[in-house]
């Protein structure tokens, strides 16, 4: 019989309301079932969700719904990473308070997320800008301070003189602020730091336990922590070139084996010797200032032209005092790594080689590959930085690099310069303590008070929270807290004298470093309920972009350890499983070229295929526009698709199904209208097949078949159930989709037969069993459609509360097996035969194979060994 088309605009809000009324997704901490905590990285409330959000949250929702059906007590919360600069920028540009802008955006985005039908526990929702959240963050800060995990020191920072704020190294581009474009200044400011370096070795070692994390992320963190074993080497300054009072330069190196290849030393622009030289030389002063203005991120250092300036200082080689080397100030040496000084071995380091070629410094090969020829080995345009055998290194020649390392380390450790060893073995880490001070209003206030008499005084916990004042103005750059007439003035908690509040706020990465813990008991009057936190942590499955591989994920690992040290949690790691999904990308379209190029939105064009080539035209004018590359969706290039438009046109289930179906979840998915329409056709087809057969199916109870014409129906359904269950366990969503398509195709004819009134009761019962399995398989991805189909079959209760089906082992076994056939130990053929075939049947079938007949060439086999359902061996 004909049925109405599935109408998502009617069905989706209706089922969302029922889930909400029934509180299906609210989690009870006292539920005794095994727990499963699934969490997607919570969003910044920018105002609108984008298709990347849809994909991220759809993946998490599949996991949550699937695990809930499998009988777990699932925690699947949502909140808002709500502090940060965009809100202050909006305040300056639009004259709206950051809080108003933020909470309006949260309301809009929450409505969008609810329209997606996500199985979220909204009762645990919070925003990090809620006073009730950040007061607990202030409590944690004070606990860390008491434990010695927080300290304050003078630190050089990148200062944007237009925005009047500190910039991270990554925010300095070609010496200018990323937002204002102003030339960045280097300033000494007193900053607050978290002692993440206390856990350097533990953070590194524990990476080996994170076997459910992508190897790429673990490697990125390993490199960021940057443990190295090396040597500090003290180089004597040639007295007649030494600045007053200076006698040596200390260098940290991981390659002391290459010392005989040294041709220069390089120091950072902020090294004490560089500062001394700059004070006496205008040219050096200007060069040091140029170095400071350049970006100090790794990317900036690697791509910038290598520059240096000879200081005139000379040092004596530690292994040969008669050998003098020049000391340069170089733009690629940083004061906050090692000692702020390096020795350059051009033959063994590409950066040093480029530098040496530029300034005419010697290049002496000192390491060659183990199969190299010392007489002919040379260095051209590429340095050799591998392991190998020492050459041109005097007493080290012929040694391996490892042997040479130890020989040099032992020799310099035994040698003296002044009254101390000239060399000392050392373990170094690239990881630096986390500076959390930000000169901004819209962040968590740091709960300390500055008193002229008492110094730095922590705010007593009984006086928390330190609330942000609401009566602030953004009519000028800088931190409004600095110029607030009353908020910063406060009595000292110790002596009662006039004092000042700290006006810096915390880095917003602090907010996201423990939110997953707060979700376990967001109503608790303390930062955590240890019992709840210890029950739920670590998060079983965390989902988010790989762009957070370093900072957020590393800071969260530190925070969990710091909270362990202060008694708030027992867990050591925050996230047991990590999945980094790919982006949603789209073609770009543009008109014009160069500076006059104008990007065009996908909604404003139509695509035609003319003479076998895809071409794009403006809807408004039929003007042809250029089809560009496929790139990450971005507002700047207008290649964005609004989820609201897709949901309004096709429904949330179609959007969810498409972003899960078109490519492996760890890869980018290319957005295409054809793909979305294909997903929509699937939802309509599934509804039509189920709804047309619903009256007949609802009259019988589901029961799989064990024989007869319905057996193939039951086998197809139960085999698919087993396979998709494995796919969901491994987050292979696209594979699950492919199998579901196959099952729909397999069930189309049986469902059509039942709809036409054909088939006996056993056949209809088997088809109903298969149809219910199909509905339950699609439910995690298309939950509204699944509920509609489930109800159409006459099932009472919500599918969202229904247990996952179990496959019948007898139905998933293959009837045939493929046996390899070996003759005298060599595989010669394969035999496909019934799983139940006895030994005689297998033997006769093997001897009848052409490949076996040819191999035997008329000979009778001495022995045939049949290992049931495994292998056949023939001995000739």
UniProtKB/Swiss-Prot annotation:
Gene3D superfamilies: 2.20.28.290, 3.10.20.590, HUPs (3.40.50.620), Isoleucyl-tRNA Synthetase, Domain 1 (1.10.730.10), Valyl/Leucyl/Isoleucyl-tRNA synthetase, editing domain (3.90.740.10). The keyword Ligase applies. It is an enzyme of class 6 (ligase). A motif ('HIGH' region) lies at residues 43-53. It comes from the Bacteria. CDD domains: Anticodon_Ia_Leu_BEm, LeuRS_core. This is Leucine--tRNA ligase.
